[in-house]
Amino acid sequence: MEQFSNADNQQASLCELSWLGGIVDGEGCITVSKRVGNRTASPIVTIVNTERKLLDKVQQLFQKYGIAYYVRVHKQLNQAECKRPLKQKVEFVIAGHKRVPRFLDLICPYLISKQPQAQLLLHFCAVRKDRVHQAFLQIDKEICSKLWVLNGRGTKW
């Protein structure tokens, strides 16, 4: 059996992480999720897709790199209303002030279109690190508003 060098492993890791960064750029969302009914928010990164092979690869890489996540499977629309069969939509969710920075630190060098959102969310996590369960300060709200504008979601609390 052929032995792989450490350089080969590093090259494979670089390739995997750059691929994952591209998936987040194209299929992901990097934001702060507001909780309805109260004034708290959580950093969140999601990847949504319907392609089983792609989803399996994302899941494999999350497990390989120790990324904590959960999965949401979205209900399909009524098939009778659609002209063609719909694929099952699956969403991988990474949430939290510790999990999100750990993931973004891995993929940030490979992001292109979502690089500004990633940098803002990393800043948000750093600013909120020691006061996760405390009231939001003006700086927290400003960071969230900038993120929401970048994502085309508005700025209201």
Model-inferred region functions:
Residues M1-W157:
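Internal intein/HINT superfamily modules and their associated LAGLIDADG
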